[in-house]
Amino acid sequence: MRLTASAIAEQFGLTVVGDGTTEVSGVATLAHAGAGQLSFLSNPRYRPQLADTQAAVVVLRADDAEAAKGTALVAKDPYTAFAKIAALFDLAPVREPGIHASAVIDPTAQVSATAHVGPFVSIGARSRVGDGCVIGTGSIIGEDCVVDAGSELLARVTLVTRVRLGKRVRIHPGAVIGADGFGLAMDAGHWIKVPQLGGVVIGDDCEIGANTCIDRGALEDTVLEEDVRVDNLVQIAHNCRIGAHSAIAGCTGIAGSAKIGRYCLLGGHVGVVGHLEICDKVVITGKSVVRNSIHEPGEYSSGTPLTDNRTWRKNAARFKQLDVLARRILAVGKEKE
């Protein structure tokens, strides 16, 4: 597929600077783009690459347009504009409606005639798969699950039981949704299992990364509201609620019954203690541990920035002495009084 700069600009409300008849047939980074490819500039650190890029068209801000040596498309937010343009060239394989001969479907399950059910899929009792859904190879849909219209489970996704997916949900390989929450009680020196009687509800337009686990609730449902984006290898425990339009980066763990607000961003390897609340529009930077509820929007951090090993060892040794040093300072202050 080939598109002119003018056609792209018209479709996405951009402004052409240069030759609007320039054609592109793909996308690439500034450093690796070649003839006939479109790229973008959103981070100022890559601005020097404009002088050398071979990209036919570059999406950028108005104040960077003069530095572009070829055709430019001016956007208020170049990265978002690029994401929309790149989708035009993302030619995903077409999945024809139908049920593969190797699939095993319970007689009480309902599968839309327009859905695609791939090889070695299992669909349990009373579950429903909606119009235009794609159920990838080896995926398992347990009992009493709902997969609403336009949703896609890639290979080896497991919906254990009582999982309800909204419309246009996309779940990547290896994810497990609706497994038992980690509910235990100590009885006479031995653990006993607390039954997990709730489910999982995932709203419209959510995306769940590979090998992520979202446990079902103990009594109430674990809930992801609409347009939540979850990266790979994330653990969301039972009874959590993730607010709409929030994004959670890889290797983050959220303990049970935590409540995350709307439009929140959690960086990689964040830990969230259970039974707390984070308000809307909070950013948690990578490696942070959230031990208390957050009631004010803003950016929060608790991780230690990288430094050379020698400096880190000195700082770590001094950190261990903080309490002793603080007591000495207080003692000196009292002596002077």
Curated annotation (Swiss-Prot):
One of its GO terms (biological process) is lipid A biosynthetic process. It catalyses: a UDP-3-O-[(3R)-3-hydroxyacyl]-alpha-D-glucosamine + a (3R)-hydroxyacyl-[ACP] = a UDP-2-N,3-O-bis[(3R)-3-hydroxyacyl]-alpha-D-glucosamine + holo-[ACP] + H(+). Its EC number is 2.3.1.191. It comes from the Bacteria. SUPFAM superfamilies: Trimeric LpxA-like enzymes. Pathway: Bacterial outer membrane biogenesis; LPS lipid A biosynthesis. The keyword Ligase does not apply. It is an enzyme of class 2 (transferase). One of its GO terms (molecular function) is N-acyltransferase activity. GO terms for cellular component: membrane. The active site is at H238. Keywords: Acyltransferase, Lipid A biosynthesis, Lipid biosynthesis, Lipid metabolism, Repeat, Transferase. PANTHER family: UDP-3-O-ACYLGLUCOSAMINE N-ACYLTRANSFERASE (PTHR43378), UDP-3-O-ACYLGLUCOSAMINE N-ACYLTRANSFERASE 1, MITOCHONDRIAL-RELATED (PTHR43378:SF2). HAMAP family: LpxD (MF_00523). Homotrimer. Belongs to the transferase hexapeptide repeat family. LpxD subfamily. Catalyzes the N-acylation of UDP-3-O-acylglucosamine using 3-hydroxyacyl-ACP as the acyl donor. Is involved in the biosynthesis of lipid A, a phosphorylated glycolipid that anchors the lipopolysaccharide to the outer membrane of the cell. This is UDP-3-O-acylglucosamine N-acyltransferase. It comes from Xanthomonas axonopodis pv. citri (strain 306). The lineage of its organism: Bacteria, Pseudomonadati, Pseudomonadota, Gammaproteobacteria, Lysobacterales. The gene is lpxD.
